[in-house]
A protein has these predicted regions:
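A flexible loop/linker signature enriched in serine peptidases of the S9 family
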Residues: 1-14, 18, 22-34, 41-67, ...
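Conserved beta-strand position repeated across blades of beta-propeller domains
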Residues: 35, 90, 132-133, 186, ...
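Short coil/turn segments that connect the beta-strands within blades of beta-propeller domains
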Residues: 39-41, 93-94, 136-137, 190-192, ...
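Conserved blade-ending motifs and adjacent loop-strand segments that build the rim/top face
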Residues: 119-133, 350-361, 473-476, 480-481, ...
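A short helix->beta-strand "capping" segment at the edge of beta-propeller domains
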Residues: 165-182, 456-476
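Extended, small/polar residue-biased N-terminal targeting/export presequences
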Residues: 634-688, 755-763, 768-780, 968, ...
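PDZ/PDZ-like domain segments forming the peptide/carboxylate-binding groove
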Residues: 671-729, 803, 880, 927-928
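Cleft-lining beta-strand/loop regions that shape enzyme active-site pockets
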Residues: 696-706, 720, 725-920, 956-963, ...
């Protein structure tokens, strides 16, 4: 199970009586896999779990030898070892059998603890040996989908014949409700129907009358990204039914066969959109190239691209009303985004914005006069999305538009209401008075809905264009996104609803409430909230209807209970009432798991091919791997087994972060648990409290059930009963606490192990007390450092390089900046961002002083915030990703000394690998790290310490932390060799006012 007395849960061995009873911790601090020797005196074990068990050829810090520990003395021995991945140890007599990949393929090896002889037992060269166990003179293991039995004496092995008979009802084709699996959506040109992608099928849903249609009905292929033709008669979508994604065009009623169009390259495709004249379709691909396809000839060509891959795909191409222009977004080398307009007639692209503001989400006005977009002038620190430096700096956008033709005036020219006398009759005047001024006329013209649907001719005059970019007045800059055009003079844009809560202890906030969609209309010159609680939205081609979707919970606009919901509302009228326009969007499809498994397996293979950060697949023969592992696919009879197979195939690329997760696996309802935030020992058949955890100071997100003032429970008390049920061993306290989290629970406690004189105390258990234990571990370390250094060193723990790590660093580092040096502990660091901010602060030196007129006049340093003495960073094998990079930067910049063990070795980042149709995923890393000398580094290696220190089980069991203690000793040694030179007083006051010549 998990050891919780640390910053993160870690695997640990316990023993429990076979007949049931109280668990007892074994003395090894951490242990993941292993077996007790036949005589019960030793344990052979693997200490570390892995973030990716299927990763092949891994040689990072998590690889450790098999440890064989004497349970009495805690002395260790190990088989000969050098960086290999050794696992699954099991005993036969005095011989330990285990799996090792030391010869390039995971095979069975043995180590004789008496003769100290190491031997290779199997010699497979294709599939790795997987799980292993031993007993009754034989070793059994998994390989190539079979269970093998090997006779230890003869060395002969055979495949064990196993017949597993079952109906496997989950593998039978069946109808499923896939409404919760909506991945993309599109609104028909006049808003009569919505098209959605759900679980790889294309459905259309009526706004009011009619039935839902499934146009595709195929579990064996994935259909994605529907888009309506401008006349509403056809839908296009991408499908991999041929084995690679192609474009299909189908009648919207689904009654005729779809037209298949092969695309020039084998990639994944995004953002399809028909031109308003119906002659072309634009789309983007995996490599951020923008394509335009001629519908008649089926020929496609590249018309633009974004040269920088960032996690969020931001090209967002849109058509002009006359089908002659495409506006899209691209990154400059500054990493700022600009709006670009491509002319299909000339084949030339024109940059609309100058790159001094970050621009996004272009949208042509229906009048053809304006190009709307969002832009930010405080993008700065957000330009590098991976860096921690951009934390706590929100990018705020304003609403802008460019007047495309230099002959057009601004719609924001001054207006004035004036009496003009009796109005002369005018055709089409409709009795409406003029608004006065050229600006009012322009605004009214832009806002007026077209009556004859004449397509405007869009021309973009480059001369003076920058001076014709207008910031829309009266709209405060905020975190806007997702701009879309409506009828002429109308645009919509979304704003994230602020998150609430702490996000689980140190994060940037809890779950948000969706988005508010604002509507801006030129005729009113103002923006108003139009919808709230929105997850996504689309505006119809005529601008008069709006399709939106809410997430789980629905939000205020849903007017319904929990669960996703879709709505079609009028976009050009009053703000819709809550719940108006809700669609009857129950989507059901016939799912054939076998066919779906084949599609998902193929998609997993393609995703690695198309999205991996280097083109050579790390040297893997990738087509052969598809054949090799695909041979096992017919034997897969459960979605979890499919993940296992995909993970094994992906392991051939030998890269970190290639996680395989999720899918349509039956959900298991978790129990709510119940924990008291305390440690216990068994004494005279009772649970005796040996430690009560509190939430230390300033941790408002932690609750300690037994440390609440007024709760009369103390260390040394015995728990006699829980909710009136007497507790005695072998019964288990945690059985009685199961389901009590967040509920009033009555404990009967006493200072003696009897019920006589006991008292009743009402407490509220927590679901998980790991946070309390982690905080206790951190505070214990801080106090140890304070004690060992006699108050001269700070201790700062950094749990990850995400927001919690950023918060923890800022909290602890600057609160201790009166210390002369610092111990930075990043053990068990879970990664996140590139911790450039932390490294910059640690590297900081001061330049001088400003005097202080208070107290004893100790001067301020400039900069004032920092610790100016030695820094020592503690690392271990459980720190990775951003937790690999941070110590690498610390070492590279020569900030200080690294103490501990080599880190994980997983320095690639993930971004935009598409999910599977059933919600699962297999990640293809999108970027890797290499040094300035043009060599890849850290991935599959880790960062080695300057001083290698192991936390041996014997030392840890004795209450020591050798890595922490060695780090303190090193920092004190460096401090003694080079004391911090800091002024404690100011120099003599200057005499600049003294006259050079005395007054007469």
């Amino acid at each position: 199970t998990r050891e919780t007395n640390g910053p993160t849960p870690a695997p640990k061995f316990y023993t429990v009586p076979a007949a049931g009873g109280v668990e007892e911790a074994m003395p090894m601090p951490r242990a993941f896999q292993g077996r007790i020797s036949p005589d019960g005196k030793r344990v052979a074990y693997r200490m570390n779990n892995s973030w990716d068990e299927e990763r092949r050829n891994y040689r990072g810090g998590k690889n450790r030898p098999i440890w064989i520990v004497d349970l009495k003395t805690l002395d260790l021995e190990s088989p000969p070892w050098k960086d290999s991945k050794d696992m699954e140890p099991a005993w036969l007599g005095d011989v330990v059998y285990f799996i090792s990949d030391r010869d390039g393929v995971a095979n069975v090896w043995s180590y004789d603890t008496k003769s100290k002889k190491l031997a290779q037992v199997t010699d497979y060269s294709d599939y790795d040996v997987k799980t292993l166990d031993a007993g009754a003179g034989a070793v059994v293991f998994e390989q190539a989908g079979y269970i093998h039995e090997l006779d230890a004496k003869s060395g002969k092995e055979h495949i064990v014949k196993i017949t597993a008979s079952g109906d496997f009802p989950w593998m039978m084709p069946q109808w499923k409700d896939v409404s919760a699996r909506i991945a993309s959506m599109a609104l028909s040109p006049t808003g009569k129907r919505a098209a959605v992608e759900a679980r790889g099928e294309i459905f259309t849903i009526p706004a009011d009358k009619g039935d839902v249609r499934n146009l595709t009905n195929s579990s064996g292929s994935a259909e994605r990204d529907p888009a309506w033709s401008p006349d509403g008669k056809q839908l296009s979508y991408f499908s991999d039914k041929s084995g690679e994604y192609k474009l299909y065009i189908e009648a919207q009623d689904g009654l005729t066969p779809a037209r298949e169009i092969a695309l020039p390259n084998h990639k994944h495709y995004y953002t399809p959109a028909w031109s308003p004249d119906g002659k072309k379709i634009l789309y983007t691909d995996t490599d951020l190239k923008l394509w335009v396809l001629d519908v008649a000839t089926a020929q496609a060509k590249i018309v633009g691209e974004d040269p920088w891959m960032v996690p969020a795909r931001t090209m967002n191409p849109v058509w002009s009303p006359d089908s002659k222009w495409i506006a899209y977004v691209k990154h400059l080398n500054s990493l700022y985004k600009v709006i670009v307009a491509y002319n299909l007639e000339t084949g030339r692209a024109q940059q609309i914005t100058d790159g001094l503001a970050d621009a996004a989400w272009p949208a042509f006005d229906a009048s053809g006069k304006y190009l709307w977009f969002l832009a930010s002038t405080d993008f700065g620190l957000k330009s590098q999305w991976l860096d921690m430096t951009n934390y706590d700096h929100d990018e705020n956008f304003g609403l802008y538009f460019a007047i495309l033709n230099k002959s057009d005036a601004s719609p924001f020219l001054p207006e004035s209401d004036e009496e003009t006398g009796a109005p002369a009759p005018a055709a089409g005047a409709g009795g409406r008075g003029g608004r006065g001024g050229a600006g009012g006329e322009a605004a009214d013209a832009a806002a007026a809905p077209p009556t004859n649907r004449i397509t405007p001719n869009v021309s973009i005059d480059s001369d003076g264009l920058q001076s014709r970019i207008i910031a829309v007045p009266g709209i405060a800059e905020r975190q806007y996104t997702r701009l879309a055009a409506g009828v002429a003079g109308t645009v919509f844009f979304a704003e994230a609803i602020p998150a609430t809560g702490t996000g689980g202890g140190g994060g940037r906030g809890g779950a948000g409430g969706g988005q508010t969609v604002h509507r801006f209309q030129l005729r009113d010159r103002r923006a108003t909230p139009f919808l709230t609680g929105v997850a996504d939205y689309e505006v119809s081609a005529d601008g008069r209807k709006l399709l939106y979707r809410t997430g789980g919970g629905g939000g205020p606009a849903a007017g319904a209970g929990a669960g996703p919901a879709m709505f079609i509302v009028d976009a050009d009228r009053l703000v819709p009432a809550a719940g108006a326009g809700r669609l009857n969007a129950t989507l059901r499809t016939y799912v054939d798991p076998k066919a779906e498994f084949k599609q998902i397996f193929a998609e997993a293979w393609r995703n690695q091919r198309d999205y991996l950060y280097v083109p050579n697949m790390h040297g893997s023969d990738w087509p052969r791997m598809r054949t090799m592992y695909g041979a096992l696919l017919p034997s897969v009879m459960h979605r979890a087994d499919l993940n296992y197979l995909i993970d094994m195939m992906g392991s051939e690329i030998a890269v970190g972060h290639s996680y395989v997760r999720g899918g349509d696996i039956p959900a298991v309802t978790p129990t709510n648990g119940g924990q008291l935030g305390a440690d216990f020992v068994i004494d005279q058949g009772r649970y005796k409290i040996t430690k009560i955890y509190d939430n230390e100071s300033w941790n408002t997100d932690l609750r300690a059930p037994l440390a609440v003032p007024g709760v009369d429970v103390r260390v040394g008390d015995y728990v006699i009963a829980v909710n009136g049920e007497e507790l005695r061993t072998p019964d288990n306290l945690f059985r009685m606490l199961d389901g009590t989290a967040g509920k009033q629970t009555v404990l009967t406690v006493n200072t003696t192990p009897t019920a006589v004189g006991a008292r009743h105390v009402t407490v509220i258990p927590v679901a998980n007390d790991q946070g309390l234990r982690a905080r206790a571990w951190i505070e214990h370390n801080r106090r140890v450092v304070d004690s060992l250094s006699k108050g001269t060193l700070a201790y700062v723990y950094i749990p990850n390089t995400g927001q919690p790590g950023y918060t923890s660093f800022n909290r602890y580092y600057f609160a201790q900046q009166d210390r002369k040096g610092a111990i930075i502990d990043e053990r068990f660091n879970g990664g996140g961002s590139a911790a450039d901010y932390i490294i910059d602060v640690l590297q900081r030196d001061f330049d001088g002083y400003f005097n202080n007129v208070a107290g004893d006049r100790m001067p301020f340093t400039s900069p004032a915030a920092g610790i100016w003495g030695p820094k020592v960073m503690i690392i271990n094998e459980m720190a990775g990703s951003g937790g690999d990079l941070m110590p690498w930067m610390f070492h590279y910049r020569k900030i200080g000394t690294l103490v501990g063990k080599r880190t994980w070795g997983g320095l690639v980042h993930t971004a935009d690998t598409p999910t599977f149709i059933d919600g699962g995923s297999a990640i293809a890393p999108r970027g890797g790290f290499f040094r300035r000398d043009d060599k890849w580094d850290v991935e599959n290696v880790g960062q080695a310490p300057d001083i290698d220190v192991e936390n041996w089980p014997k030392d840890v069991a004795a209450g020591h932390d050798p890595q922490l203690e060695r780090a303190v000793a090193e920092a004190l040694k460096q401090l003694a060799a080079k004391p911090v030179e800091r002024a404690t007083r100011e120099p003599p006051s200057p005499t600049w006012g003294k006259r050079l010549k005395p007054l007469p």
